[in-house]
């Protein structure tokens, strides 16, 4: 796996699924391929994106700044600086300085990542802030190691939280989660359907599913009534894809 592929993997792991994630992936690919060279326009686009947390925006801004060649005098962006200040906690800043000194001695991506993984997310963000604000310099490879360590920690905590929700025994949470998943699956079906005859069929199925979820939420239904809703939808989607000659078995 190449270095940039690894960086892209880690960074995308902390972005919530949805159309925005697909757009960010496309822009990252362009940046890493040297196609997008207007850093200012890229940062302005990032700043105004909804849904993303300030820290995720800060990390993406840091990655774009490391990768896109820019004029030396280009202003640092406030939204990135604020996200990478470790919540203003002086302890984070102290640890960030210690980490920075260790990173200065590293020359490889993996070496930097290993060193960084033993620090808290706040300290890692502060250390990125030091480098972003030009208070310290490390090689791009080492900076990417720091980015990936931060993303790994964030993804770990997101995974723990997700696992807790998936394994919860609370029937109301499970019921709502199934309805949310069915609704997003229906939305994806509508986006994937083109304008053929079969597409109209897929759109109809998706539309009915969304109406059903809306009705279930409006009148309040038994928590078990949503069981299998998403799976039924996915079966419909796969049947539609088969007729269109597309084989995508990995939706579940």
UniProtKB/Swiss-Prot annotation:
Record's keyword annotation contains RNA-binding: yes
Membrane-binding, as annotated region: 1-164
GO CC annotations on file: host cell nucleus; membrane; virion membrane
Entry's family note: Belongs to the influenza viruses Matrix protein M1 family.
Keywords per UniProt: Host nucleus, Membrane, RNA-binding, Viral matrix protein, Virion
Entry membrane topology: Peripheral membrane protein
Gene of this entry: M
Domain of life assignment: Viruses
Source species of the chain: Influenza A virus (strain A/Duck/Germany/1949 H10N7)
Protein name: Matrix protein 1
Motif window: Nuclear localization signal: 101-105
Pfam short name (any one): Flu_M1
Any GO BP: viral budding from plasma membrane
Taxonomic classification: Viruses, Riboviria, Orthornavirae, Negarnaviricota, Polyploviricotina
């Amino acid at each position: 796996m190449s270095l940039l592929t690894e960086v892209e993997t880690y960074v995308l792991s902390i972005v919530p699924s949805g159309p925005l994630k697909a757009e960010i992936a496309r822009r990252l690919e362009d940046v890493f391929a040297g196609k997008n060279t207007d850093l200012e326009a890229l940062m302005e686009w990032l700043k105004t994106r909804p849904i993303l947390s300030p820290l995720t925006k800060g990390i993406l801004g840091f990655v774009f700044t490391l990768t896109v060649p820019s004029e030396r005098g280009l202003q640092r962006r406030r939204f990135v600086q604020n996200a990478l200040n470790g919540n203003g906690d002086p302890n984070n800043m102290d640890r960030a300085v210690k980490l920075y000194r260790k990173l200065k001695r590293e020359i490889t991506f993996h070496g930097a990542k290993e060193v960084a993984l033993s620090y808290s997310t706040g300290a890692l963000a502060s250390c990125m802030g030091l480098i972003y604000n030009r208070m310290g310099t490390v090689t791009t490879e080492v900076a990417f190691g720091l980015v990936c360590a931060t993303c790994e920690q964030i993804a770990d905590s997101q995974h723990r939280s997700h696992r807790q929700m998936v394994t919860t025994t609370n029937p109301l949470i499970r019921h709502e989660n199934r309805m949310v998943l069915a609704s997003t699956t229906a939305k994806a079906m509508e986006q994937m359907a083109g304008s053929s005859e079969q597409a109209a069929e897929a759109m109809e199925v998706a539309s009915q599913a969304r109406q059903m979820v809306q009705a279930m939420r409006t009148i309040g239904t038994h928590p078990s009534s949503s069981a299998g809703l998403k799976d039924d939808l996915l079966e419909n989607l796969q049947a539609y894809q088969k007729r269109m000659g597309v084989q995508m078995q990995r939706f579940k």
